[in-house]
């Protein structure tokens, strides 16, 4: 299952969804012959790597959301010696404007393939120099795919989700509302969003974007 909060804030909704995933998977453990790889820690790390995504325009909120996920990994671990190095969440919880989009290079599938190979390696890498090298390569691939456009785009930063299911299974969150928009922003939203009519409210824009992010049958 792939879950996204496009206005992630401090990460309350993704952490809540992670706990639901863990509760469900843990309930099934008693019915399985092997318990290997089915600790609470294993479930949490797997959910963070494979199920949870978030975006926020506020860098401070993004860092708090990352910290919240990191803390959730170690909070139940009684033996500090058993705690593994924390994963790298830079391409899981991302700073960006969820209402933006980017024109893509039409001939970029090989770039996406490489990007989707590097991100799991970056997530799990503990060596500082290797992390820097992976991040450098990932950022360069994103630059090439976007033709140097630095705006955020879900289909680029979370491309693995859209290549497998063409969207998320679940989009959650509390859409921001009542934000002050410049005339330039209003013109952009009127061009890109059907809900941008009359007095434009970011709540409606986020709701429209959330629906567009869903895979077929998503909620």
Predicted regions located by residue number:
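SAM-dependent methyltransferase catalytic region
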Residues: 1-219
